[in-house]
């Protein structure tokens, strides 16, 4: 499913129960529902961008040591991972087994390569609270339930916190809450619209469900920065 359009870049998300690594591309994208871009998009040619800088094709797996060697790093001391909104399409969801499988795999691989590395899991921010859900996904189907989607975000963050605090990972992993440090009301894309056809009063209406404005991304960056400062000051203590 085509999720968002940027200059010279299209971003896709997988549909329900679709875990294929790359989408099949035809010669045209036709608008079906949601979003603010309704025109057909003609595809002349395309290529896929490598999404994982740590992937080693030779071994078909993440390879952190080869990555460090390539860029002249002696090793890894601190790791900050934002486990994103991708795949959080079920309202009121409490089952994140598919996500935790890969989260555990990632953290274990890092720990095996660099046993002294300290990992910080960053939770996800709350989605748009003033219309962005409807702008992107309409009034039916996945993501359309705003309160249900917000509940899923809370439940997912709780899952990540419990994972970080579990016996398996608590010695080298911690959880940092992003949603408490993110302004979902004012740092999401929005436009001014009349409150109704008989009034000149305007209000801000969201135009994107889960992708922040630049200021919003910078605010998520602030969450990382605070975590980094704490690690430096406290010497990586949880």
Predicted ranges, named:
Residues 1-96, 101:
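Conserved SGNH/GDSL esterase-like catalytic core that processes O-acyl groups on lipids
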Residues 31, 77-82, 118-123, 174-177, ...:
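Structural recognition of the beta-strand scaffold that forms the well-ordered cores
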Residues 84, 108-115, 161, 165, ...:
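Sec-exported extracytoplasmic/periplasmic mature domains
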Residues 88-96, 128-137, 184-187:
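Extracytoplasmic/secreted cell-surface and envelope-processing proteins
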Residues 103-107, 157:
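Generic structural signal for well-ordered alpha-helices
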Residues 127-179, 214-219:
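Substrate-gating cap/lid alpha-helix
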Residues 176-208:
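Mobile gating loops/cap/lid regions near enzyme active sites that modulate substrate access
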Residues 196-238:
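Histidine-centered active-site loop/cap adjacent to the catalytic His
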């Amino acid at each position: 499913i085509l999720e968002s359009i940027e200059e010279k870049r299209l971003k896709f998300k997988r549909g329900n129960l679709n875990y294929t690594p790359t989408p099949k591309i035809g010669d045209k994208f036709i608008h079906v529902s949601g979003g603010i871009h309704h025109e057909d998009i003609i595809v002349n040619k395309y290529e896929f961008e490598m999404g994982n800088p740590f992937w080693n094709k030779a071994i078909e797996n993440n390879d952190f040591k080869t990555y460090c060697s390539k860029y002249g790093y002696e090793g890894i001391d601190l790791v900050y991972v934002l486990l994103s909104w991708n795949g959080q399409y079920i309202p009121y969801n409490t089952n994140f087994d598919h996500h935790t499988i890969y989260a555990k795999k990632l953290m274990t691989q890092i720990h095996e390569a660099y046993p002294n590395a300290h990992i910080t899991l960053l939770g996800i921010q709350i989605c748009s609270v003033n219309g962005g859900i409807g702008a992107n996904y309409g009034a039916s189907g996945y993501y359309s339930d705003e309160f249900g989607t917000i509940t899923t975000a809370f439940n997912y963050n709780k899952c990540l916190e419990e994972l970080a605090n579990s016996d398996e990972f608590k010695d080298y992993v911690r959880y940092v809450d992003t949603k408490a440090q993110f302004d979902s009301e004012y740092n999401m894309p929005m436009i001014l619209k009349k409150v109704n056809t008989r009034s000149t009063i305007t209000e801000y209406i969201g135009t994107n469900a889960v992708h922040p404005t630049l200021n919003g991304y910078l605010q998520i960056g602030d969450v990382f920065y605070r975590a980094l400062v704490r690690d430096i000051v406290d010497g990586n203590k949880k």
